């Protein structure tokens, strides 16, 4: 016990040091120490900040080679310099070391933002929220304070922002009409809404509204939880229609006044251009930085207001609570361009709900248990595993291993395997790459021996 107390004290001091390093990375060095940011920090000091950032964002174990770590460190240093130079200008918004601080802007855009998608067919533009002379709207509104906005969520590395934007708007109108804030399932949209939308490869909110209407409702996040990967549609959960909507409409385009009128009545799905470096590293304040109108990210407008004479929108993102203002962004409102900041007024849309949800049918039956994955007549792996041959001769496999992922890549070393999102095996580094020569990698998984079933193998074959 005598050894335990000093150890705990050392750990506590280390944690304080880490916390201080992270805080220092967000406040300019000039403010804290009175020296120039450019060249003001030593290499060791920046490395300390970087190591603390890795721990904070759970990336400490994600770099599997010194070359990769050195490359990420150089990118981090450049982003840190960009953050400090911006914050020294005392503008309306501040930057910080977000979860994207070790990515170049090209990497950030290619991994976390979807390609621009054009809606097929005409928009359902309605005059319901068209701005008119004489409209009396509140000076500010925040649907979070009215209980119509669920907790900030995190889409992860899946390009499913469209699903989070859709669900956020549906959760909002459902609470406004029924009084119940029910957290709904983005994963159901990712898995099941595949007629036009493409799961982790992008989609549009209007198509997702159409899916919910045609399906007769959508399930809860609790019963159909988010996984962050494309999956097979669970038909039983798809038929659990907990929350319904009756229709959807589009806000008149290129009109921030019409968008204001819409947001005064309910949370609104919006699309914006989020690919700029300042957006990548946004920390707080009213964002009025450089951005265009190449819409590549779906979010939710949940309010608006004014601070020190500057109008803003309140926007809920889907990158977790560590990004921005606890997961939110304030964007400049009433700018000179009719498209709004970052194109916010180009494609806003919203669900319509006229009445209560269907009666609660009680607990739904669990989804059927999937059978084991069958490797051949003599070996099986657990459900949702991939069979990988351990020993083969000619065309025959004499021993099987199990990779604990669906649709995995079996590496040629007969020992490891890779997720289907990172299908390229790097046997030298023991990692899986997003593509050949890609900077993005994860650690390769080990196979486990398959289960033999000598006596009943043939009996179980369908």
Swiss-Prot record:
Protein localization: Vacuole; Golgi apparatus; Cytoplasm, Stress granule; Cytoplasm, P-body
Group of enzyme by EC: hydrolase
Keyword Signal: yes
Keyword Ligase carried by entry: no
Glycan-carrying positions: 90, 414
Cross-referenced InterPro entries: Granulin (IPR000118), Granulin_sf (IPR037277), Papain-like_cys_pep_sf (IPR038765), Pept_asp_AS (IPR025661), Pept_cys_AS (IPR000169), Pept_his_AS (IPR025660), Peptidase_C1A (IPR013128), Peptidase_C1A_C (IPR000668)
Entry keyword set: Cytoplasm, Disulfide bond, Glycoprotein, Golgi apparatus, Hydrolase, Protease, Signal, Thiol protease, Vacuole
GO biological process, any: protein ubiquitination
Active-site residue list: 161, 297, 317
Notes on how activity is controlled: Inhibited by the cysteine protease inhibitor E64 (L-trans-epoxysuccinyl-leucylamide-(4-guanido)-butane).
EC number: 3.4.22.-
GO MF annotation list: cysteine-type peptidase activity; peptidase activity
Subunit note: Interacts with SERPIN1. Interacts with PRN2. Interacts with WSCP. Interacts with TZF4, TZF5 and TZF6.
Function in brief: Cysteine protease that plays a role in immunity, senescence, and biotic and abiotic stresses. Involved in immunity against the necrotrophic fungal pathogen Botrytis cinerea. Involved in elicitor-stimulated programmed cell death (PCD). During infection by the necrotrophic fungal pathogen Botrytis cinerea, functions as a PCD-promoting protease that is released from the ER body or vacuole to the cytoplasm. Accumulates in endoplasmic reticulum-derived bodies in epidermal cells and may participate in cell death in stressed or injured cells.
Family note: Belongs to the peptidase C1 family.
Name this protein carries in UniProt: Cysteine proteinase RD21A
Species of origin: Arabidopsis thaliana (Mouse-ear cress)
Lineage: Eukaryota, Viridiplantae, Streptophyta, Embryophyta, Tracheophyta
Name of the coding gene: RD21A
